[in-house]
Amino acid sequence: MSYYQQQCNQPCRPPPVCPPPKCPEPCPPQVWPGPCRPVMCFEPCLPSVWPGPCRPVVCYEQCPPQPWQSTCPPVQFPPCQQK
């Protein structure tokens, strides 16, 4: 099972071609104040040391559209590994 299938439990989607900008909202390095809420980051924020049950991992297709997505050329990615 690929990383994206395992994390999202959805059909695989290719990652963004261009380097994504900073997170739409700041990603706390260690402490996430208040109740758990999704972090709309294209890369998870320190999932291995994330405190508590919060899971900031978000599928790429669930992230809000970014301006660079319309200008980046598409790139072919290998098909997802099925197990």
UniProtKB/Swiss-Prot annotation:
Sequence repeat segments: 21-29, 30-38, 39-47, 48-56, 57-65
Domain of life: Eukaryota
Cellular compartments annotated: Secreted; Secreted, Extracellular space; Cytoplasmic vesicle, Secretory vesicle
Residues passing through the membrane, by range: none
Induction text: By type-2 cytokines IL4 and IL13 in response to helminth infection.
GO biological process, one term: antibacterial humoral response
Loss of function: phenotype: Mice lacking Sprr2a1, Sprr2a2 and Sprr2a3 show an expansion of Gram-positive bacteria in the small intestinal lumen and mucus layer. Mice were born in normal Mendelian ratios, are healthy and show normal intestinal morphology with no signs of inflammation in normal conditions. They however show an increased abundance of Gram-positive bacteria in the small intestinal lumen, with a marked increase in the relative abundance of Lactobacillus, Turicibacter, and C.arthromitus. At the same time, a reduction in the abundance of Bacteroidetes, a class of Gram-negative bacteria is observed.
Keywords tagged on the record: Antibiotic, Antimicrobial, Cytoplasmic vesicle, Disulfide bond, Lipid-binding, Repeat, Secreted
Any one GO CC term of the record: extracellular region
PTM summary: Forms five pairs of intrachain disulfide bonds.
InterPro entries linked: SPRR2
Role description: Gut bactericidal protein that selectively kills Gram-positive bacteria by binding to negatively charged lipids on bacterial membranes, leading to bacterial membrane permeabilization and disruption. Specifically binds lipids bearing negatively charged headgroups, such as phosphatidic acid, phosphatidylserine (PS), cardiolipin (CL), and phosphatidylinositol phosphates, but not to zwitterionic or neutral lipids. Induced by type-2 cytokines in response to helminth infection and is required to protect against helminth-induced bacterial invasion of intestinal tissue.
Protein name: Small proline-rich protein 2A1
Recorded name of the encoding gene: Sprr2a1
